[in-house]
């Protein structure tokens, strides 16, 4: 790996904002090899694109998919990220919950402990809540 890649590089490249940094980020992504993209940075990038740039969910998902597929970028588990994006986009969960669903699906656990009833929209995992006393 040549370097871990930070959210600000991805956001500049994806948004073109501000233009000078965006050009530098895009050139860097095109010229480097084996940049490691970790899941936490993906989550933060989703948050920034949604909150600051008010990008629609479909655009955010497409942008992250393009980063996962980018030639110079390496992900620890690209299939997990892609499934997280699918759940995020189609089941309309926050990215963190979508990521938990994808983790539960790819393990033998199959359950997510959460008060967030939106997880119930995904029929591949079971949501459990802490019991009332």
Regions found by a protein language model. Name each.
Residues 1, 101-133:
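Acidic, PIN/NYN-like endoribonuclease modules and their adjacent C-terminal/linker elements
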Residues 46, 50-53, 57-66:
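Active-site-proximal, substrate-binding regions of enzyme catalytic domains
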Residues 72-113:
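Active-site neighborhoods of divalent-metal-dependent phosphate/nucleic-acid chemistry enzymes
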Residues 12-14, 48, 122:
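Residues that scaffold the ATP/ADP-binding catalytic core of kinase and kinase-like folds
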Residues 6, 44, 97, 116:
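Acidic active-site catalytic centers that drive phospho-/nucleotidyl reactions
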Residues 1-37, 52-59, 131-133:
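Short, well-structured N-terminal submotif of metal-dependent ribonuclease cores
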Residues 39-47:
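Short, conserved active-site loops that position catalytic residues or coordinate cofactors/metal ions
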């Amino acid at each position: 790996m040549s370097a871990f890649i930070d959210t600000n590089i991805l956001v500049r490249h994806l948004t073109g904002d501000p233009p000078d940094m965006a050009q530098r980020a895009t050139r860097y992504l095109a010229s480097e090899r084996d940049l490691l993209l970790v899941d936490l940075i993906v989550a933060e990038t989703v948050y920034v694109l949604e909150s600051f740039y008010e990008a629609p969910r479909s655009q955010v998902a497409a942008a992250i998919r393009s980063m996962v597929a980018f030639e110079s970028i390496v992900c620890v588990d690209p299939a997990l990220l892609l499934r997280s994006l699918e759940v995020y986009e189609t089941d309309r969960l926050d990215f963190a919950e979508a990521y938990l669903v994808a983790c539960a699906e790819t393990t033998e656990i199959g359950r997510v402990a959460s008060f967030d009833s939106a997880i119930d929209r995904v029929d591949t995992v079971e949501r459990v809540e802490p019991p009332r006393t």
